[in-house]
Curated annotation (Swiss-Prot):
Role this protein plays: Converts N-acetylmannosamine-6-phosphate (ManNAc-6-P) to N-acetylglucosamine-6-phosphate (GlcNAc-6-P).
Signal peptide residues on this chain, from the entry's feature table: none
Pathway it works in: Amino-sugar metabolism; N-acetylneuraminate degradation; D-fructose 6-phosphate from N-acetylneuraminate: step 3/5
Originating species: Salmonella typhi
Protein name: Putative N-acetylmannosamine-6-phosphate 2-epimerase
Top-rank taxon, per record: Bacteria
EC nos: 5.1.3.9
Keyword Isomerase among record annotations: yes
CDD domains in the cross-refs: NanE
Gene3D superfamilies named among the record's database cross-references: Aldolase class I (3.20.20.70)
Enzyme class: isomerase
GO CC annotations on file: cytosol
Amino acid sequence: MSLLARLEQSVHENGGLIVSCQPVPGSPMDKPEIVAAMAQAAASAGAVAVRIEGIENLRTVRPHLSVPIIGIIKRDLTGSPVRITPYLQDVDALAQAGADIIAFDASFRSRPVDIDSLLTRIRLHGLLAMADCSTVNEGISCHQKGIEFIGTTLSGYTGPITPVEPDLAMVTQLSHAGCRVIAEGRYNTPALAANAIEHGAWAVTVGSAITRIEHICQWFSHAVKR
């Protein structure tokens, strides 16, 4: 059975929760062994896949995990707003470190490497691809290229103001277009995650609400202030 078929079966049997194990950069939790522990805990609690940033984190997580790993590398570039897996060598490094699925910024913004070249390199390694998109048009374009997973990852993050609520309308439109949608971005409660599934998402990625202790503590701290 192919990886995609196994993942489809897992989503059908266990639900579509993907956990993004990305600690706050530079925080006490930002250590590969802690990321690996997070990933194992997420998988033991029902996550069908995890999303891991960085080669050292991925190498540390891989031996301890049987569920698929979505691998990314984040970079801050001077000549492009694209941050997620912008280079071909990033794809190579993620593949060598054990990623099953490679996600990359698929927005229609200026970029060092075009989407087709990134996809070709992912296919060269025999891996699945996830397009992190900011608009419906981007998602449909990537779906037409044969990219397996279309994420709403960048919706609300390419403009000056980030909305509070997730983009459920984007989920619905991409689902109606036939995409295998991974809802991602501001799904910080179980109710919002359930709403994404109700709106047609194939799976939902949750990050901060599960793995970023600083964010969660701030939510509670602000709530109890007098």
